[in-house]
Curated annotation (Swiss-Prot):
Composed of six subunits; NqrA, NqrB, NqrC, NqrD, NqrE and NqrF. GO terms for biological process: sodium ion transport. This is Na(+)-translocating NADH-quinone reductase subunit D. It comes from the Bacteria. Pfam families: Rnf-Nqr. InterPro entries: NqrD, NqrDE/RnfAE. Keywords: Cell inner membrane, Cell membrane, Ion transport, Membrane, NAD, Sodium, Sodium transport, Translocase, Transmembrane, Transmembrane helix, Transport, Ubiquinone. It is a multi-pass membrane protein. It catalyses: a ubiquinone + n Na(+)(in) + NADH + H(+) = a ubiquinol + n Na(+)(out) + NAD(+). It is found in: Cell inner membrane. It comes from Shewanella oneidensis (strain ATCC 700550 / JCM 31522 / CIP 106686 / LMG 19005 / NCIMB 14063 / MR-1). Its EC number is 7.2.1.1. Its main location: membrane. The keyword Translocase applies.
Length: 210
């Protein structure tokens, strides 16, 4: 029973209670860049989830054999190898999305969420729970990306996943898109609003004043 409870906490905790973006403020740079469309936000979320989950798994499997002095190098080597695999798969099967994501898939290597979970969790926890932790943090990251991408694409372009929902004035409709929402700074403000909303309803997440 305790294992099931811990598994549930590992999977669902990062979505709201310990969200890597909203609480820890990690991985913000990619969130600003890839959320102008829901499609790219979803693919980026899936890519980071896969890399985080499998890097956690592999690092946890060999954690007792990694010398402390080179552990960061080993972690980065595993993460970089997985990022290359994900990038090649995207180029092979989703080339247009891969072009839109540009360098941001490659920059998963330096994403604080991936490195943070590898160092703080996978190095101390058995493989299966580490794998689930990677999925949970990927879900938390993806939830913020999809929420921001939903607002930016719908109100910035009047569409969702490329399908026109709000018919634009330029096409004879009624909606005037807000082009500002398609610019990266808008994502910064939207993420800030999400953090404010979450911390309003969960005041325990507010940092203590020193």
């Amino acid at each position: 029973m305790s294992d099931a409870k811990e598994l549930k906490q590992v999977l669902t905790g990062p979505i709201v209670n310990n969200n890597p973006i909203a609480l820890q403020v990690l991985g913000v740079c990619s969130a600003l860049a890839v959320t102008s469309k829901l499609e790219t936000a979803l693919v980026m979320a899936l890519a980071l989830t896969a890399v985080t989950a499998f890097s956690n798994l592999f690092i946890s499997m060999i954690r007792n054999h990694i010398p402390s002095s080179v552990r960061i190098i080993v972690q980065m080597t595993i993460i970089a190898s997985l990022v290359i695999v994900v990038d090649q798969l995207l180029q092979a099967y989703a080339y247009q999305i891969s072009k839109q994501l540009s360098v941001f898939v490659g920059l998963i290597i330096t994403n604080c969420i991936v490195m943070g979970r590898a160092e703080a969790y996978a190095m101390k926890t058995p493989p299966m729970m580490s794998f689930m932790d990677g999925i949970g943090n990927g879900l938390g990251y993806g939830a913020i990306l999809l929420a921001v991408g939903f607002v930016r694409e719908l109100f910035g372009n009047g569409s969702l996943f490329g399908v026109q929902i709000l018919h634009k004035i330029s096409d004879g409709g009624w909606y005037q898109p807000n082009g500002l929402l398609l610019l990266p700074p808008s994502a910064f403000f939207l993420i800030g609003m999400l953090i404010w909303i979450i911390r309003t309803y969960k005041p325990e997440q507010v940092e203590a004043k020193g």
